[in-house]
Every structure is written in C-alpha cells, then in structure tokens.
C-alpha cells in the first residue's frame, strides 16, 4: 500500500504542466541516466556499447499521447527508420512500440490505424530477421492490445512479434494462459502505470508473488520468457526454478532498464545468461522519466541529489 501511495504522489505531481516544464529545462542531465539520448545515433551507439559487454538491446522511440492520425503515421515512419539504422549498423533490430503511439483506436478506412502501422513496422523488422515487442499500457488498453497481438502473431509469427504482461493486474494470469496456443514470446513486468485497486494489486508483496507465477507458468508451458526485473530475489528464484525443471538458458532472458543495475547486467551475462537492456530514446522522455522516479524512492533520491549538485 505504501508503494502505491508513493507512486500516486509522484505521478500526480509529475502531471502538473509547470513541473514538466521545469523538468525539461533542468533535468535532462539526470534523465540521460535512464534515456539513451534524443537521437537515433545516440541510441545505436548505446546498443553497440552494450553488445561489447555481451548484452543485447531493446530500442524504444519514446512518444506518448500522440493525438492526430498523421502524427501517428509519422511516428511509425520514424520507428521504421530506427529499424533500418539498426540493421545498417550490424544490429539485429529489436524494438518496442506502444500501439497507442502508432494509432491504436483511430479509424482509417475502416481499420485500426495502430494495427495498420504495426504491420508496416513488423514487416520491416522481419525483413532483417528482427523482433517487435508490443508494449502494454494501462488496463484500459489490455483487451485491444492482446487482440491485435493475436492477429499480428498469426500474420508474422511469434519469432517476430511479442508482447508484455503486467503482474500488478489481477487479470494477467488468465491472459497469459489464454495466449498459450500462440507459443508467445512475452516480457513479464511488474507494471509502472497508476492503476486503481479494482484492477491491480495495491501491495508490492502481491505484485511480486504474481510476477513469479507468471514467469514460472510461462516457462513451464515451454514459451520463451523475458524476465524483466532488477529484483535479485526474483532473479535468484528464476535461476533455481529453471535448474530444477531442466530449462535451458536459451529458453529465457533477463531484461533490465538502461542505466539501472549495470553491475548486475554484466554479472548475469558473465554467468552465461541472456541479458537484454531496454533502451528508450527520443525527445519525448518526460513521461518515461517520471515513471522511473515513481518506481522507487531510491530513484527519487537520485534526482534530488542531482538537483542539489546542479
């Protein structure tokens, strides 16, 4: 409950226009710990640096609350440019997108614009042997996102498109089971949006326990699993689980956020585990940065210390 109250307080303050304006003026030097620059070039360089340490990248062009269909299509074009740039740099493209950013819920000639643009993006990634992860947003978009995910897996294959489930939502265990027929590649996260107790666990202990259930059930079902957490207790539990069940290191990977626990990322890679780092980049970094601060008081303390030094 305390964690939920903390998250709510931080995100409520972050939504104030004057706070966003101040942050954009004063906090980029702090945000760049969590964001891999504002350009494609800086993001590609960040992936290359990770790969030198045996760690893969998951690129994400930041852009939320895009309102017009034209801007959504322009955003999709920019994602395609990112995929092409990654391929040109010798990187197998692995990119996350929010379907809302490419037009989910907007009609174009009788079809969802988000689905249309996602098809273009995934087709380009598939051309280069790459992969697109459909990020999950707040609970109001879960149904349509999973429906569109099912459609896209049918068209492009589970080896080229995956999605995300959030352990703080009560419904996620059922959603996971409902997707088993697809043999889906799913990233398991705890969840960073502010959700009401009617749909999400308010207590961290319940979120953590549900996270373990999601990961263990997905692994036991024989599906590729992305264990996206920095929680060392959970990481150790996953290590023990796969060892006890004879699950190979090629059946899953650990995923972490750019700028957080780099030591742990390198340690896991050195132990022979697959490790991938989520690398957000772009000018629209504020909402993402706010959610990172809201995750833990430790991140907020980092920002306060940086402001005092600055």
UniProtKB/Swiss-Prot annotation:
| Cofactor entry | FAD
Query: Which region is the signal sequence?
Result: none
Domain of life of the source? Bacteria
Which GO BP annotation is one of this protein's? proline catabolic process
Q: Which family does it belong to?
A: Belongs to the proline dehydrogenase family.
Pathway annotation:
Amino-acid degradation; L-proline degradation into L-glutamate; L-glutamate from L-proline: step 1/2
Q: Name one GO molecular function term.
A: proline dehydrogenase activity
Protein name in the entry: Proline dehydrogenase
Specify which residues bind FAD according to the UniProt entry for this protein: 136, 166, 187-192, 229-230, 292-295
Q: What's in the keyword line of the UniProt record?
A: FAD, Flavoprotein, Nucleotide-binding, Oxidoreductase, Proline metabolism
**Keyword presence, Flavoprotein:** yes
Q: What is its EC number?
A: 1.5.5.2
Task: Give the catalytic activity.
Answer: L-proline + a quinone = (S)-1-pyrroline-5-carboxylate + a quinol + H(+)
Query: What role is this protein assigned?
Result: Converts proline to delta-1-pyrroline-5-carboxylate.
The UniProt site entry described as Critical for catalytic activity is assigned to 278
Keyword DNA-binding in the entry? The reply is no
Looking up InterPro entries in the UniProt record yields: FAD-linked_oxidoreductase-like, PRODH_bac_arc, Proline_DH_dom, Proline_oxidase
Recorded consequence of changing residue 63 to A: 140-fold decrease in catalytic efficiency for proline
Q: Which residues bind substrate?
A: 98, 291-292
> Which positions are catalytic residues?
135, 187
The main enzyme category here is: oxidoreductase
Q: Kindly give the Pfam families that the UniProt entry links to this protein.
A: Pro_dh
């Amino acid at each position: 409950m305390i964690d939920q109250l903390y998250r709510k307080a931080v995100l409520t303050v972050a939504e104030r226009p004057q706070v966003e304006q101040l942050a954009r003026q004063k906090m980029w030097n702090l945000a760049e710990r969590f964001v891999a620059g504002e350009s494609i070039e800086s993001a590609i360089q960040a992936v290359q640096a990770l790969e030198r340490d045996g760690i893969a990248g998951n690129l994400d062009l930041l852009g939320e609350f895009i309102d017009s269909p034209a801007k959504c299509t322009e955003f999709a074009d920019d994602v395609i440019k990112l995929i092409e740039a990654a391929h040109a740099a010798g990187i197998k493209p692995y990119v996350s997108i929010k379907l809302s950013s490419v037009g989910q819920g907007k009609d174009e000639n009788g079809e969802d614009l988000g689905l249309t643009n996602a098809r273009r993006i995934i087709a380009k990634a598939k051309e280069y042997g790459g992969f697109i992860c459909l990020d999950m947003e707040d609970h109001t978009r879960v149904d349509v996102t999973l429906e569109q995910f099912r459609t896209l897996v049918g068209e492009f294959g589970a080896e080229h498109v995956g999605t995300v489930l959030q352990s703080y939502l009560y419904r996620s265990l059922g959603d996971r089971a409902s997707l088993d027929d697809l043999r889906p590649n799913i990233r398991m996260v705890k969840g960073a949006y502010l959700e009401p107790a009617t749909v999400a666990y308010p207590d961290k202990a319940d979120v953590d326990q549900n996270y373990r259930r999601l990961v263990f059930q997905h692994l036991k079902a024989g599906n590729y699993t992305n264990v996206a957490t920095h929680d060392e207790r959970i990481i150790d539990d996953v290590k023990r689980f796969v060892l006890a069940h004879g699950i190979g290191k090629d059946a899953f990977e650990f995923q972490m956020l750019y700028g957080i626990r780099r030591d742990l990322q390198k340690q896991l890679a050195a132990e022979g585990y697959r490790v991938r780092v989520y690398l957000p980049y772009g000018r629209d970094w504020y909402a993402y940065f706010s959610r990172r601060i809201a995750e833990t008081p430790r991140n907020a303390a980092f920002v306060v210390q940086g402001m005092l030094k600055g």
